[in-house]
Design a protein with these regions (language model features):
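Long, charged amphipathic helices and adjacent flexible linkers at domain junctions
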Residues: 103-121
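Aromatic- and glycine-enriched glycan-recognition loops and surfaces
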Residues: 125, 129-218, 224, 247-254, ...
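Active-site neighborhood of glycoside hydrolase catalytic domains
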Residues: 179-186, 192-196, 218-326
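Flexible hinge/switch segments at interdomain interfaces of large molecular machines
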Residues: 113-117, 161, 225-232
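Short, flexible loop/turn elements at secondary-structure junctions
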Residues: 45, 80, 127, 159, ...
Length: 326
């Protein structure tokens, strides 16, 4: 049939919450696992994306993919280069199973750190304790991890903030010091306990986000993405920090760097991102507001490149409430 179909997102930070930057086209009838011609594509971009599929009057299909142009007009200086995201695709004559395996092989070889090596298994405390834990509970869970034979214990949300202790998701996000009441001996006590038990220690962070009830928000409200003439709209009681701002990039890098400097035995980071961008406005960008969606992603990439350069052997997972970003 003639016409156009668009798959896109405008959520900013947690861009993939409702759809993924991925498509699968069957070219000779409905695709099956082991037969049929299949084209599979995805986009190397962590922000807003758009896939447009259009069939013309000659029954020819055009696929246009890239950064979503929504609210993203971008002005360039003379001779400035704008690099568009990479488009990755594979073609299979033997069904969607082979196309999937092609992507897995490519990702392991070229994209994922140590992709062809075995992955660590872990025990995460989140659904065992949620925010209600102390040192004794965590050490007991480490014993369970040892008994299960997993490689690592991962401490999830709830370990930080003191003025507004992280007793729930309504406060503390942005204040990355251990909560003294929960962890009087600090993260170092836990990394040492894990080491003695023969397992590794990982930790949860969400450095791109902030609760309004936090010391960070009180000190740096200008770092927060929000419209000054609108009521703030919260997703999981939080807002998104403005990663187009180099000072915010330094702060976000510092969350990882400070923890690694103090506790070099941390072996893994679970980097969360639970909120889309709402009421979008950047104090930093001033009259270039249409740059924000793009410069946010570039700022994130800059931070991750800095982390990779300083800690090249440190594995990280960007989970975003599950598969909410790529």
């Amino acid at each position: 049939e003639f016409g156009k179909k668009t798959i896109d997102t405008k959520l900013g930070a947690r861009a993939n919450m409702f759809c993924s930057p991925f498509f699968q086209l069957a070219l000779d009838g409905k695709s099956e696992e082991n037969q049929g011609e299949v084209l599979v594509g995805t986009l190397g971009w962590t922000g807003n994306f758009s896939f447009v599929f259009e069939v013309d009057n000659k029954n020819e299909l055009r696929v246009i993919s890239g950064i979503n142009p929504y609210a993203s007009e971008y002005s360039l200086k003379p001779n400035e280069i704008f690099r568009t995201p990479d488009f990755y695709f594979t073609y299979s004559f033997t069904g969607k199973g082979q196309a999937s395996r092609n992507f897995h092989d490519w990702a392991r070889k070229y994209q994922v750190k140590d992709g062809n090596q075995t992955r660590m298994t872990l025990l995460n405390n989140w659904e065992a304790t949620y925010f209600d834990f102390d040192e004794a509970k965590l050490v007991k869970l480490m014993d369970d991890a040892v008994e299960l034979g997993v490689d690592m214990f991962l401490l999830d949300d709830g370990w930080f903030a003191n003025k507004y202790p992280r007793s729930g998701d309504h406060q503390g996000l942005g204040d990355w010091d251990e909560t003294a009441d929960k962890l009087p001996h600090g993260i170092g006590y836990l990394t040492e306990a894990a080491k003695k038990k023969g397992i590794k220690f990982g930790i949860w962070i969400e450095p791109e986000m902030v609760n309004p009830k936090s010391e960070l928000y009180e000190k740096h409200k200008d770092w927060v993405i929000h419209l000054p003439n609108r009521d703030e709209y919260y997703f999981r009681n939080q807002l998104v920090l403005d990663l187009s701002n180099p000072k915010v990039q330094d702060y976000v890098f510092g969350v990882v760097d400070n923890l690694m400097t103090k506790y070099p035995d941390i072996a893994f980071f679970k980097w969360d991102c639970n909120s889309p961008i709402t009421n979008i406005y950047s104090v930093y960008l001033k009259d270039k507001q249409s740059h924000l969606y793009i410069d946010y992603v570039r700022g994130l990439y800059n931070v991750l490149e800095r982390v990779k350069a300083k800690y090249p052997d440190l594995p990280m997972m960007l989970c975003s409430g599950g598969g909410g970003r790529s």
